[in-house]
């Protein structure tokens, strides 16, 4: 699929333009400068033509900190790989030194570029005061738009399609491929999610730095491993709600993480092995379990743990005790920074997904039920007649009982254990239960 990149200095309205073109609110939009830190992508469909649109972080001329420097590096690397660039400038303020520096880089890269003057609500004022100086950037006729007010976006789309077709790129809409395993990578800030994400993808796609809170937007990318397609989502670190100010960019990012979990098949929960398992780790794992997603637990930064060769059992016990409610999850010890056990993470994802999509025959369920009930005492008056699996993603079982009110948590634990021990282990997947009254 053709790739179109939106670039420009901070706060010229790139994310607003992105959201309007993809027709959904995916990139975070705020008045705060430099809100977009990671590239965000989606598909644009327009009159039967499709292309991938990528919203990049604002390019600072002279980045003053490590985050800004990393943002610039990621964006400039993506420019070199793009089919077309939308160079966005401020149609009210005109050009700045930052615009001129980026224009110089774009010209040297020889990438096809469309100059977009955003915030040009007043076209007469734009034509008179701003447009003449834009020609000095060297990209020909600028296209004035107002993303916020939906002005001239059709003209922009027509120009994009024309440019891409002139390059001989196939823009025909194709049926969406839904056989990919969707994987969300979640965890507290600075546990190494982005480093793990990049180790799996083996390229600098997500922004990685040692400063907590670097990733704000979910970043997703496709990868084929041994012929299998995955879509990985690297999500912003979840912090405790009490530590997140309302109406902040970070608050929006936390909502986006929950949304990423909702859309995932398998969630990789990343823990910092140097810090053990915290209350917030437990909250995140609980969120994944309640949403009914398959899960893999990763102790990252294993290379920094002292005497690690003798401590596998200790950390496994810690996992079983503190994350007992997802103890069905595969547990992997990694150093994403050094590339340790990345293949095992992939294997665990495959195992969890296989469990998540497995359906077992009713005969196996009821055979196990009869066998175990023969030596099990149920609460007085409770009878379990038979059961069957009614769904996958997650595996969901319906049991027919004489009294739903008598089915308490111990009986639910008993039935889940019965299924895992006697029918199918469902390693990596939660098991949901439903009950129906029957005589």
From Swiss-Prot:
GO terms for biological process: ribosome biogenesis. Pfam families: KH_dom-like, MMR_HSR1. GTP 2 binds at residues 190-194, 300-303, 336-337. Residues 2-168, 181-357 form the EngA-type G domain. It comes from the Bacteria. The keyword Nucleotide-binding applies. Keywords: GTP-binding, Nucleotide-binding, Repeat, Ribosome biogenesis. GTP 1 binds at residues 8-15, 55-59, 118-121. SUPFAM superfamilies: P-loop containing nucleoside triphosphate hydrolases. GO terms for molecular function: GTP binding; ribosome binding. InterPro entries: G_ENGA, GTP-bd, GTPase_Der, KH_dom-like, KH_dom-like_a/b, P-loop_NTPase, Small_GTP-bd. The keyword Repeat applies. Belongs to the TRAFAC class TrmE-Era-EngA-EngB-Septin-like GTPase superfamily. EngA (Der) GTPase family. Associates with the 50S ribosomal subunit. PANTHER family: GTPASE DER. Each G (guanine nucleotide-binding) domain has activity on its own; domain 1 is twice as active as domain 2. The G domains do not interact, instead each contacts the C-terminal KH-like domain which lies between them. This is GTPase Der. It comes from Thermotoga maritima (strain ATCC 43589 / DSM 3109 / JCM 10099 / NBRC 100826 / MSB8).
């Amino acid at each position: 699929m053709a790739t179109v990149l939106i670039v420009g200095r901070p706060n010229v309205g790139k994310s607003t333009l992105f959201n309007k073109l993809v027709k959904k609110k995916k990139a975070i939009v705020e008045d705060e400068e430099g809100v977009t830190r990671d590239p965000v992508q989606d598909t644009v469909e327009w009159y039967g033509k499709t292309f991938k649109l990528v919203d990049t972080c604002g390019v600072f001329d002279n980045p003053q900190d490590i985050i800004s420097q990393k943002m610039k590096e990621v964006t400039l690397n993506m420019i070199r790989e793009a089919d077309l660039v939308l160079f966005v400038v401020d149609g009210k303020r005109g050009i700045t030194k930052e615009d001129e520096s980026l224009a110089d880089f774009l010209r040297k890269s020889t990438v096809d570029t469309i100059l977009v003057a955003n915030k040009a609500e007043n076209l007469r004022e734009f034509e008179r005061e701003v447009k003449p100086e834009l020609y000095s950037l060297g990209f020909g006729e600028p296209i004035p738009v107002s993303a916020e007010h939906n002005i001239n976006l059709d003209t922009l789309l027509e120009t994009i399609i024309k440019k891409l077709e002139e390059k001989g790129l196939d823009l025909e809409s194709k049926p969406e491929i839904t056989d990919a395993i969707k994987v969300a990578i979640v965890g507290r800030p600075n546990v190494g999610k982005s480093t793990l994400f990049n180790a799996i993808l083996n390229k600098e796609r997500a922004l990685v730095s040692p400063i907590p809170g670097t990733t704000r937007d979910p970043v997703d990318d496709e990868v084929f491993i041994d012929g299998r397609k995955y879509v990985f989502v690297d999500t912003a670190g979840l912090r405790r709600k009490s530590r997140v100010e309302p109406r902040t960019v970070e608050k929006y990012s936390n909502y986006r993480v929950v949304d990423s979990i909702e859309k995932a098949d398998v969630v990789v929960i990343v823990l910092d092995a140097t810090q053990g398992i915290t209350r917030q780790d437990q909250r995140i794992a609980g969120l994944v379990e309640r949403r009914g997603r398959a899960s893999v637990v990763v102790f990252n930064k294993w290379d920094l743990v002292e005497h690690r060769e003798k401590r596998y059992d200790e950390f496994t016990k810690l996992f079983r005790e503190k994350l007992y409610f997802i103890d069905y999850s595969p547990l992997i010890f990694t150093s994403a920074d050094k590339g340790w056990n990345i293949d095992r993470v992939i294997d665990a994802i495959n195992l969890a997904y296989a469990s998540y999509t497995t359906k077992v025959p009713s005969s196996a369920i009821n055979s196990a039920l009869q066998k175990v009930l023969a030596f099990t005492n149920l609460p007085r008056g409770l009878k379990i007649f038979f059961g069957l699996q009614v769904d996958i993603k997650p595996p969901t079982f319906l049991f027919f009982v004489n009294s739903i009110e008598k089915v308490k948590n111990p009986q639910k634990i008993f039935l889940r254990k019965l299924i895992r021990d006697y029918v199918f282990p469902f390693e990596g997947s939660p098991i949901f239960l439903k009950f129906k009254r029957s005589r």
